[in-house]
Design a protein with these regions (language model features):
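Bacterial N-terminal signal peptides
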Residues: 3-15
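Extended, histidine- and acidic-residue-enriched regions that form the cofactor-binding/catalytic faces
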Residues: 19-164, 168-291
């Protein structure tokens, strides 16, 4: 059984009691269900009845908005991968996913004519490893690559020409590269291409930028946490770095660097998002120019 099929079976399987055929048009409690039996309007061909919503995130757009954006030239899509893992006592397990909320938005707008697919929130790993930390949820390498493959094919089928893969967690990079290479072989001559962009994963450069441009020097405490990570996350969600609780406990500091005042930390986070955006957009444009 292929990973894609196995995943589909897990997602769609229903309890036996739920699979018992019901009376057509009937709902529990005797109400008639007309929504699933009445003819459905072919919305794909209808004119969009409201103004376009301003978002780069596909899941925040209607189908007609996505359709019209593609027709207007937004044929680049970002596939972003994060993870759910141990990040110390202050950062939530979704650290990488929260970073991508900030960087994904910025990269899409900086590149232009670009939409963002739903974030792949789980990273590859061994789900049977006995010492998984509390809260960690991982996919096998095969399943992770199957998800990337299915997402890419879904985007290509509806008209996206350039699929850009970006990973915020180091363990994501190799399987992303492999998935991109396999897809490009399968799509040869089809007018679409996958771009794997390792330049995005540049935390060493971010740390150097932090020291050079912001004058911040961290003294590492041994936690899976850094000032630059906390600052970037703070631009989208201060609860994800546990600001209220840490302020109350007198622990609103990381690696010797105060996170208060929060306005300064957010401003620094925005500068680091801008830095990562510039590097990533340049790398994407360079990859696209090779076609």
């Amino acid at each position: 059984m292929t990973p894609s099929l196995a995943l589909a079976l897990v997602v769609t399987a229903a309890p036996l009691c739920a699979q018992t055929p019901a009376t057509p048009g009937a709902r529990p409690g005797g109400r008639t269900a007309s929504v699933n039996t009445a003819p459905r309007i072919d919305a794909e061909t209808m004119a969009r009845p409201i103004d376009m919503h301003d978002s780069v995130w596909i899941e925040h757009l209607t189908m007609l908005e996505v359709r019209d954006l593609i027709k207007a030239g937004s044929t680049t899509a970002l596939i972003l991968t994060g993870g759910i893992e141990e990040n110390g006592p202050y950062l939530t397990t979704g650290k990488h996913n929260n970073v991508l909320k900030a960087t994904g938005e910025s990269i899409a707008r900086g590149l232009g004519k670009t939409l963002v697919a739903p974030v792949v929130t789980l990273e590859p790993g061994n789900p049977l490893r006995p010492n998984l930390s509390p809260g960690t949820v991982v996919l096998t390498q095969a399943t992770f690559k199957a998800v990337l493959t299915d997402m890419s094919n879904s985007l290509k089928t509806q008209g996206f020409k350039d699929i850009v893969m970006i990973g915020d967690s180091g363990g994501n990079l190799t399987p992303m590269k492999e998935a991109a290479e396999a897809l490009n072989m399968a799509w040869a001559g089809a007018g679409a291409r996958v771009h794997f962009i390792p330049e995005y994963y540049n935390y060493a450069d971010v740390e150097a930028f932090e020291e050079r441009e912001l004058g911040i020097h961290e003294k590492m405490e041994g936690l899976h946490d850094d000032y630059y990570i906390s600052a970037i996350i703070a631009t989208v969600d201060t609860d994800a770095i546990r600001m209220p609780e840490r302020v109350k406990a007198g622990r609103f500091v990381i690696n010797g660097v105060p996170l208060a005042p929060i306005e300064r930390t957010i401003a620094n986070g925005r500068r680091m998002v801008e830095f990562r955006t510039q590097v990533t957009v340049e790398a994407i444009k360079k990859s696209m120019a090779k076609q």
